[in-house]
Amino acid sequence: MISVVKRPERRYFYETNGSAISKESFRIVREGADLTAFTPEEAQVVVRMIHTAGDLDLPRRVVFHPDLVSAVRGALRGGAPIFTDANMVKSGITRRRLPADNEVRCLLRDERAVALADEWGTTRSAAAVSL
């Protein structure tokens, strides 16, 4: 038998549209963060970093190599894979926004990373870099 669950009564208003929530969240980041030290292209990256970390003070600790943004864009357009050491990050990457259907990999749970980490006395993240 399937039990019927009553929908809870809404006692206050909150945004339920995911797109609107995201748009407002990025607006808050852009308005609240000091991005003056960055080029417009770098600022786009920093805004995403802040949004992910939830830290408006993050820009004080970010430095870019002058060629970083163009190098990364070129690599992605060329089909370079994206490696991360967090499955949550992998899940959060919007694949349709990638320019070349880039592969997104996280080797944190790869048995080879687990074995190397144990053998080398390091973390799985550090070991995965060698795979």
Task: List where the protein language model places each region.
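Amphipathic alpha-helical interface surfaces
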Residues: L68, V89, S125-A128
